[in-house]
Amino acid sequence: MAEKQAGLAGEPNPDCTVTAKAGPEVSSPGTSESRDYDSNCVFCRVAAGQEPETELLYCENKDLVCFKDIKPAALHHYLVVPKKHIGSCKDLNKDHIEMVESMVTVGKTILERNNFTDFTDVRMGFHVPPFCSVSHLHLHVIAPAKEFGFLSRVVYRRDSYWFITGDYLLEKLRK
């Protein structure tokens, strides 16, 4: 029981509550129902260029932005964020699969642009509510993972109750 709760079995946590929702709750690509911008959201302001102290890194995707994490867990720690406001990975549905795939691609590209190519030593994933520091969907791109201190190994633990990889999220959205 404790092994399952702590996610020590090495398998994705089957109790993770990220599910493929039937319809949009916060934002859905191409709908007028989406709340594209939240002035109270720091990541919305960063994406809109309203936080001049945050340097946006080159990103080839017009719907995403990328910038360095303010509390890096390793030498390379970037955040890939959709420009449209989406609360968290729990707000996603099948319509968001392409966006999540693009976020992962942008993450890999930013690492390559910064001369990091050992993708066996990379941690990419999303925090699951209520463990999100900012309520705006963001992909953590962190390398090298072998540099993690004790706390970072806990905070960014793969497929735990609080942090899931992009691959795990995509698997859940496709079901």
From Swiss-Prot:
GO terms for cellular component: cytoplasm; nucleus. Keywords: Acetylation, Cytoplasm, Hydrolase, Nucleotide-binding, Nucleus. It is an enzyme of class 3 (hydrolase). A motif (Histidine triad motif) lies at residues 136-140. The active site is at 138 (tele-amp-histidine intermediate). It comes from the Eukaryota. It is found in: Cytoplasm; Nucleus. The keyword Repeat does not apply. It catalyses: adenosine 5'-phosphoramidate + H2O = AMP + NH4(+). Residues 33-144 form the HIT domain. Pfam families: DcpS_C. Residues 1-35 are annotated as: Disordered. AMP binds at residues 69-70, 138-140. Expressed in retinal ganglion cells. GO terms for molecular function: adenosine 5'-monophosphoramidase activity; identical protein binding; nucleotide binding. Forms dimers to octamers and even larger oligomer. Interacts with CALM1. Belongs to the HINT family. Exhibits adenosine 5'-monophosphoramidase activity, hydrolyzing purine nucleotide phosphoramidates with a single phosphate group such as adenosine 5'monophosphoramidate (AMP-NH2) to yield AMP and NH2. Hydrolyzes lysyl-AMP (AMP-N-epsilon-(N-alpha-acetyl lysine methyl ester)) generated by lysine tRNA ligase. This is Adenosine 5'-monophosphoramidase HINT3. It comes from Rattus norvegicus. The lineage of its organism: Eukaryota, Metazoa, Chordata, Craniata, Vertebrata.
